[in-house]
Each structure stands twice: as structure tokens, then as C-alpha cells.
Amino acid sequence: MEKVDTSGRLSKLRELMRAHSIDVYVVPSEDSHSSEYIAACDARREFISGFSGSAGCAVITLDKAALATDGRYFNQASKQLDHNWLLLKQGLQDVPTWQDWSAEQSAGGKIVAVDPELIAAAAAKKLAAKIHKFGGSELVALERNLVDVVWGKDRPDRPRNPVVILDTAFSGKNVETKLRDLRQELVKKDSLGMVVSMLDEVAWLLNLRGSDIPYNPVFFSYAVITLDTATLFVDDTKLHPDSLEYLRKNGIVTKPYSCIFDDVKALTSSKGVQGREKRTLLSSKASWALKRALGGDDLVEEVRSFIGDAKAVKNEAELAGMRACHIRDGIALIEYFAWLEDQLVAKRIVLDEVEAADKLEELRQKQENYVGLSFDTISSTGANAAVIHYKPERGSCPAIDPEAIYLCDSGAQYLDGTTDVTRTVHFGCPTAAEKLAYTLVLKGNIALDSAIFPKGTTGFALDCLARQHLWREGLDYRHGTGHGVGSYLNVHEGPIGIGTRVQFAEVSLASGNVVSIEPGFYEDGAFGIRIENLAIVREVQTQHSFGDKPYLGFEHVTMAPYCKNLIDISILTTAEKEWLNAHNTDIFNKTKDAFKDDALTLAWLTRETQPI
């Protein structure tokens, strides 16, 4: 990972800050739609800081610069940030949040500015209150993005890729039904309508997909839904005649993407039940710019999105697709690991991290309904595996060492579902420490996968099940244990998750959710271990039903064996061995027929799924 010299960029930015009488400038990671993963044209924080991770916030003053990020990226950020930057390791004791650091730098009535399109309205409100309380300072919405000015002509163009229709056979619910369900919620809230700004929510609601953001099948758009109208704000160059006709048949009007702010201003308040003013609903993740355009607190009600909640609970067609695509994805993974071992060990061929990742992509491309990858493949050998979101660079990454840990975190987009899986393997003789760490992580994975819990339980409450065996050894990991996953949509999907963050205590898991289970352990400079499966949350039968509550459990859908070479069988319980054997039998039975004419892969699969 090479450092970028940001001195010139920061100097130009500070000149602009002085010209606008700004003392502190905040550069978030997100785009205008609060997207975690963004198009190249929206990578402003990366451009100004040199840090390429998916999460973080840059704060620049007239003489300092700080980059805040979470535990997934401490290692990466320390390697990528140059001498101009202070790294704020969020979540560590005595390290201020970027909001607190901004407030400290603004003390004394200074001006803090941010592009209002790039920060959620709720986040802007909290930041404004914090800096005002700290030193009487003011948060200013600066609509001219100063990083864009510094970037200039080198800034990439905004993608204008075509929009495609997702067949109801895959979505499981037509647009008419989804709009009806949303309008029922609008009636319950006695609201004028809802502005939909999250890209995956627009795509899900209208059964459309795109490719404007790498690995995420979404397209730049907004939607405004009222009780009797539906408007899609999108560049018309994206819409082919079939898409236009599809939208027309479903009563959806199209307008240019750039018209959203002017149009929402026309959504005026009217009297509702009991004579109160009707408000327009806005997701709690929507931008400050949208809220300002709608008229502020008096005319807007921020809510947890009904669409996000509905999207997270997959219907039976989506769940069937998830099961099916994971079997096909598992076939590609099994073929990959068998091939990789043969290349590295039997044939002693030298392969680097990118060459291996390319082979895995090639194998996935052969599978039915394949569209593309769901994120950059993390193909990492040895110490690189300790970089949680490592990205190998073509032409400069190391060769895979068969005598070291190899971690591969990968996934794909299929028309019938989205996959995300991590397997950690060792083709040689692992150390006792590596085997212990791997087995502790495996035990945590099994513990969470086996959990049964009452309806209403949150991912926050379940998180410790995955960490318990590491904790007993004084070990842990600095990332969440699980995230929601879309159905041929974003690989990271809210509002659910499993982890220690506050938001995971706010939304309980529900039958139909798809979530990852991915404990890990990372020894900086040495090795990293992560084991990740996707699982469907399902109602389970229990002998009793205390409080008349249904009970839930997990149905794992990932079909890839664990690394037997890294398992210390002596510390597995009988129940854990039984779970592992049942899991391996399931994998073998669902994938073996694909290898009838592939003796090498079938032999590898048979060996790796033998009972222990």
C-alpha cells in the first residue's frame, strides 16, 4: 500500500477554506445517498486523504488534518496516511470521535462547514449541537464542494449505466404490491408522502437494478411516493424503451435526477387528522440537503425507513434464490480451493494474490445467473491476512505462501441472490498458535450458528456468543460479527446486524433476514483468521413457548468446507463435532454431483468433508 502525498491537495483546500471564511471542513465518506460503497466520482475522502477504506471521515483545519476510521481499517490507514494526517482510531479509549475532535478544533466561535448532500440530516443536527455547546461555533451547509474544486478536471464523471428490470421470479413481489404496502404505511403516518434517497431502497421498491457503483447493483436515483403518485428521478439516458414502458405501466413518472431538490420544495404541507400539519417522511439516513429542501423540522418527519425494514425480510422467492445461488457459489469455491492447493503444493506453481482472485472470479462466472462480484475479493497471504479489509494490488502483491495462512473473503452477485463468504486455509504445517486461533474462531461461529433465541432478540444481544471462546483466552476482534445482506443488492444491508454498535441494539432480528456470521482474529504483522457464512433467520420449533413468543434460529446457506488442517480437534466438544460433521455432510450432498467429471475437486471435497 503506497502513501499518497496529500500536501498539495491540502494546501489548495485550505486556500479555498480561507476564501470562504471556514475554519474546519468535514469530508465524509458517503455520497448524496448515504452509500457505504461509492462511485469513483464520489471518493472525495479518499482523494483528499489517500485512505481508500470504505469507512471513515476526514476533518481538515487550517493547520491540521485528521482521519477517523474504525477497527477494520486501523492497519490499512496507518499504512496509507502520509505525514499530514492524524489517525483517530474510533472506539479506542481516550481517542476522540471525529465529532469531538471537530468541536475541539472549532472552539472559540469558529466556522465548521460540510457539504449538506454528504451528511445525514440527523448526523448534521448532532454535530451542530456538539460544536455549539463546546465553543459557541456554527455548522454551515456549504453547497459548493471544496474537494471537488481541488480535484478539478481529474474528477471522474458520474456513471450513466443502463437500468435493467428484475423479473418478479427473482424479486418475489411486484411493484404494484410494494407501492401499495408503502402507501398503507403513509396512511398510518398521515403523511403527504415519502422521499426515498437510499439507492438500494429505490432499486428494491421498483424491482430495478443498475451498475453505477462497483459491485452494488444500484443506479443514481431518488423516488418520491405519495398516496396517488410515484416519481423516479433518474437520468433518462439510463432508461431504455423497455424500462420506460415498464415504469409507465406501473404508474411511475420519470424526471431528471438533478431536479430532485427543486421538486421536493413543491411538496407543501396540508392539514391532516385532528387538524395537524401533514409532513413528508424522510429516512433517518437521508441527507441534510434533502431535509433543508423540504423545509426543515416543521415539514419533515424522519423515520426508520419502512422500505429498509421490508427489504431486510426476504420473501420465499428471495430465500429460495439465496439457497440456490449459494449452492452454485459453493461449487465455485470448492473448485477454487482444490485448484489452489494443487497449484501451490502438488505443482509448486507460484501464484500471487491477484492471480488467485482472478481464478476464483473465472470459476464464478461459469455459474448460472452470475452477474458480477459483490465486493473486491480479499485474497491475502500471511501478514496481509491481518489487514481486515485488505485489497491486493495487481503487479505489486506478494505470491501466496503455501506455508502461511491464506484468507479469502469473496462474494458474488447473482440474479437470484448475493453471496459473501470467508474461508481461511493453510496448505502446509500451521503453528500451534494458528490452530488455536482458528479453532476458537470456529467454535464462535458454531455457537452463534447454533443459537436459538426468542423473537425480539437483537444482534447486539447475540454478538457475545461468537466472541466467548476468544474472550476466555483474552482475545477479540475489531469488527462486527454480522451484517445484513441484500437479495441481488448490496452485500452490506441494514437495518440489522450483529455486533457491539448501538444501532444493532435498535432493531431485532426477524424471520426472513439474511445475515452474515463472521468472527475472526488478527495478529498484526503475522496472520489473520476469519470464518464467514451467510445464514437465514427462521422460526424454529421448541418444546415450549415461554410467553407465547416464537423462537428463531439460523439456517446456514454457505456451502464451503472449513479447513481441517487448521482445526485443533482436541478442544472441540462432542456437540461441536456433531455440528461440523452434519454441516460437512450437507455440503457434500449438495455439491458433489457438480464434480462427477472432476476427479481432483471431488477428491478434495471428499477429504475436507470426512467426519472428524
Curated annotation (Swiss-Prot):
Key words, A-Z: Aminopeptidase, Hydrolase, Manganese, Metal-binding, Metalloprotease, Protease
GO molecular function ontology, one term from the record: metalloaminopeptidase activity
Alphabetized InterPro entries for the sequence: Creatin/AminoP/Spt16_N, Creatinase/aminopeptidase-like, Creatinase_N, Pept_M24, Pept_M24B, Peptidase_M24_C, Peptidase_M24B_aminopep-P_CS, X-Pro_aminopeptidase_P
Sites where the protein binds Mn(2+) 1: 420, 518, 532
Pfam families: Creatinase_N, Creatinase_N_2, Peptidase_M24, Peptidase_M24_C
Annotated cofactor note: Binds 2 manganese ions per subunit.
Cofactor: Mn(2+)
Disulfide topology: none
One example of a Gene Ontology biological process annotation: proteolysis
Cellular component aspect of the GO annotation: cytoplasm
Residues annotated for Mn(2+) 2 binding in this entry: 409, 420, 532
Catalytic activity: Release of any N-terminal amino acid, including proline, that is linked to proline, even from a dipeptide or tripeptide
The UniProt record lists the keyword Hydrolase: yes
EC number(s) on file: 3.4.11.9
UniProt record similarity statement: Belongs to the peptidase M24B family.
Biological function: Catalyzes the removal of a penultimate prolyl residue from the N-termini of peptides.
Name assigned to this protein: Probable Xaa-Pro aminopeptidase P
Organism annotation: Verticillium alfalfae (strain VaMs.102 / ATCC MYA-4576 / FGSC 10136) (Verticillium wilt of alfalfa)
Organism ancestry: Eukaryota, Fungi, Dikarya, Ascomycota, Pezizomycotina
Gene name tied to this protein: AMPP
